[in-house]
C-alpha cells in the first residue's frame, strides 16, 4: 500500500508522497514516546534524542574503527513511518503517519500528554515540548499573536489552529458594509454642485442661475446633517465598547488564573521545604544513632581483645603447670576437673597424654 506523508507539526500545508512504497509502519507505545532519550551510547551509556547526535558522539570515543563501522545489513534498512497510538487521532491512520521519530514524539507530547515539564516563570504557562517552551520565552511579555478570547500565542500555526476551534471570536458587524456604503453615499453628492438637488426646496420660486464653478470646494460641514447615519455610529460605538469589555474580562481572568497558579506553586514550595527540613532532621538523628552504635562496637571490640588476652594467659599457665607435674596420681587428679570443661578438654588432654608417656618412659 502506498503511504503519503501527512501535514507536519510545524504547519507545512504541503504533504509529500513517500517514494518508497514498502515503508514500514511502526506503532510505538505511549511509554516509549514519552522517553526523553531514545538512543543510548553503548560505551558511556549517555542518551540522545536523535540517531545523528549519537553517531556524532561516538566519534569522540577513541575506539577502533571496526566498532564504529556498520554492516551492510544495517545500511539497507527500510524506511519507517510512525503512527500515533491514540485511536481517535488523525495520525493513527497509516495514511497520515509521520515520517520522523522526533516528530511523532513531539506530536504525542503536545497533543496527548498531560505532564507539562517546562513552566514559564513569568506567566506560569506549561509546555510539554522544550522547543515550544523556548519559542514562548522569546515572545513572553509581548503581544505576539493574540486571539479575541484573550489568549496569546507565540507560534503562528498554534494561533491558526486555535482560531479554527475558538468559539469566543469577535463577530464581524453585519452593518459595517452598509455603513461604508452610506458614508460613500454621503460623500458622493458633495462632489457635485448641481442645483437640481435644490429643486424641491425652491418649488414655486423662479430658478436661479447656478453659481460659477470654482476651484475651491465647499467644506463638508456646509451640507445639511443626515440623521440616518446616527444609528450606525451608535452601533459602531456599542461594538467597540463590547470588544473592550471582552478583552478586559479576558485579561482579568488571565490575571486571576496566574495568581491562583502562583499561590499553588508557593504552597507546594512551602510543603517541599517542610519535607526537606523533616528529612534533614531524620538524617541527623540517624547519624547520631550510627555514631553511638559505632562507639558501642569499638567498646565491644576492646572487651573481646581483653578476653582473648586473658584466655592466652590461662592457656600458658596450664601448659606451665602440666610441665611441672611428675607424679602419675597427681596427673590423674588434675585431669578430672579439666575434663569437665568441654571448651579446653581437647587441648589439656593432649598435654596430659604427652606428659604421661614421658613419665612411663623414664
Swiss-Prot record:
Localisation: Nucleus
Origin superkingdom: Eukaryota
SHR-binding as annotated region, ranges: 155-167
Entry-linked PROSITE patterns: ZINC_FINGER_C2H2_1 (PS00028), ZINC_FINGER_C2H2_2 (PS50157)
Residue ranges the record marks as coiled coil: 252-319
Main location: nucleus
GO CC terms: nucleus
Zinc finger residue ranges, C2H2-type: 39-61, 82-112
Induction of expression: Not regulated by auxin.
GO molecular function, one term: DNA-binding transcription factor activity
Record keywords: Coiled coil, DNA-binding, Metal-binding, Nucleus, Repeat, Transcription, Transcription regulation, Zinc, Zinc-finger
Binding site for Zn(2+) 2: 147, 149, 162, 166
Claim: Transcription regulation is one of the keywords in the record: yes
GO biological process, one term: leaf morphogenesis
Tissue-level expression: Highly expressed in leaves, hypocotyls, roots, vasculature of cotyledons, floral organs and in the endodermis and vasculaturenof inflorescence stems.
Protein name: Protein indeterminate-domain 16
Name of the gene this protein is made from: IDD16
